[in-house]
């Protein structure tokens, strides 16, 4: 069973186009970027350049997206990496079709609700071996590559292998997040210090970071394909380590893992079709918010005003309530996605908003997740929207020896109460 996947969604910023600071509003800080031969956007400049270089070599949007994701797993391990999951949408020019990929992993087959009940757990821990599910990222790479890739995987992963071996400078933000996570986990779990510190010390802004362990893992993946990760030594060593730490993830869980090609879902917002992946992702929360907020005329509501903030907050609270109550593995949802995305349902939810006071909705808890987002377009017009995550923060704290990555803690999302949409089973 796959658990509920949370992503960080930033909504309801100004609806104006990007403008130069001199010609636009005072708070405008970025110009529109226009390119003739493709474009890459990510949270890390070096990773973005890796993607651009792949496009220059004739790679597709998918080739570049995989290369960027691999670089981010090295350069921003606080939110991503091959120990996590992957979700993607691909626009294919040739078929004029939008494809969706759910590359999230399932919980260990041997870990049952009965175990948590007998050991008096009221919730799944956020760290350690128990929240670890099968990491789906690498399988996601190869699923995407088999359909839409062009360059050899060795070429795609080589830039990240080089950076892992030769080093790269740590940015201020990532140094901050690394310090928070490493200082906590290195006191609790093995292999964290050896993998993520610089000469045994917490990384500081500007420090040159290397990760030979991850370079070796990338080399194995580049040479041996997805089976090198799921049916080889990486899977065996990871499963052995997790079980030594008291967990249940087994080699068989890796060997039987598969990603799923799925149909994206959409809503129409003021004439624009907006697409997302269905649960177990939380992308439809964005679509629900758009449906509810569509009826408000923001040309008459000043941006940042009390009224504007009130509407946005109430809409988010309503949708987060649905997210907590209904979103789950699509095979186990008790309400159809089409119902949640209907305009009639949005109108009923909108009617609950009092324009003068905050509603007492039992909103779902907003997660503090570690996630990276990237998007790529190539010269032919193919486009990729990809999100990849270790879930909360840097992940579970579980770092298999000499592999260079931390495993996700997405299993924390399961509900241990019986009968809910996202109950552990």
Annotate the PLM regions.
Residues 275-283, 371-375, 387-398:
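Glycine-rich phosphate/pyrophosphate-binding beta-alpha loops
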Residues 295-389, 402-403, 410:
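Internal maturation/activation junctions in enzymes
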Residues 1-20:
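Bacterial Sec-dependent N-terminal signal peptides
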Residues 36-38, 85-87, 262-264, 286, ...:
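Short glycine-rich loop/turn motifs
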Residues 19-49, 61-224, 229-231, 236-281, ...:
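Noncatalytic scaffold domains of N-terminal-nucleophile
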Residues 74-78, 84-99, 248-250, 382-425:
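Active-site rim segments in enzyme catalytic domains, especially the processed small/beta chain
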């Amino acid at each position: 069973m796959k658990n509920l996947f949370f992503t960080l969604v930033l909504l309801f910023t100004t609806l104006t186009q990007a403008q130069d600071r001199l010609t636009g509003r005072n708070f405008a800080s970025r110009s529109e970027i226009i390119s003739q031969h493709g474009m890459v956007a990510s949270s890390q400049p070096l990773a973005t350049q890796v993607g651009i270089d792949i496009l220059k070599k004739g790679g597709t949007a998918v080739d570049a997206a995989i290369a960027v994701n691999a670089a981010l797993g090295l350069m921003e391990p606080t939110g991503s990496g091959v120990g996590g999951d992957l979700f993607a949408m691909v626009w294919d020019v040739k078929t004029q079709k939008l494809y969706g990929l759910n590359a999230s992993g399932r919980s260990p087959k041997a870990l049952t609700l009965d175990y948590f009940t007998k050991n008096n757990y009221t919730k799944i821990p956020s760290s350690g071996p128990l929240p670890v599910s099968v990491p789906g990222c690498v399988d996601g790479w190869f699923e995407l590559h088999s359909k839409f890739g062009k360059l050899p995987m060795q070429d795609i992963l080589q830039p990240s292998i080089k950076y892992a071996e030769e080093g790269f400078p740590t940015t201020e933000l990532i140094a901050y997040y690394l310090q928070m996570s490493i200082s906590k986990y290195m006191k609790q779990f093995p292999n964290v210090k050896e993998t993520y510190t610089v000469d045994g010390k917490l990384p500081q802004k500007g420090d040159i970071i290397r990760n030979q362990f991850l370079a070796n893992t990338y080399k194995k993946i580049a040479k041996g394909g997805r089976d090198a990760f799921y049916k080889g030594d990486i899977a065996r060593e990871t499963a052995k380590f997790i079980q030594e730490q008291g967990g249940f993830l087994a080699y068989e869980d890796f060997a039987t893992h598969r990603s799923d090609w799925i149909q994206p879902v959409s809503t129409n917002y003021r004439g624009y079709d907006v697409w997302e992946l269905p649960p177990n992702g939380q992308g439809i929360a964005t679509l629900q918010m758009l449906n509810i907020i569509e009826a408000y005329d923001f040309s008459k509501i000043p941006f940042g005003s009390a009224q504007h903030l009130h509407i946005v907050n109430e809409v988010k609270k309503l949708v987060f309530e649905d997210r907590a109550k209904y979103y789950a593995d699509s095979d186990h949802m008790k309400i159809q996605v089409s119902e949640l995305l209907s305009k009639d349902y949005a109108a009923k939810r909108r009617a609950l908003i009092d324009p003068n006071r905050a509603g007492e909705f039992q909103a779902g808890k907003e997660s503090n997740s570690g996630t990276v987002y990237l998007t790529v377009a190539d010269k032919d017009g193919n486009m990729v929207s990809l999100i990849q995550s270790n879930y909360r923060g840097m992940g579970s704290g579980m770092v298999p020896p000499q592999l260079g990555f931390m495993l996700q803690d997405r299993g924390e999302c399961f509900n241990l109460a019986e009968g809910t949409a996202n109950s552990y089973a």
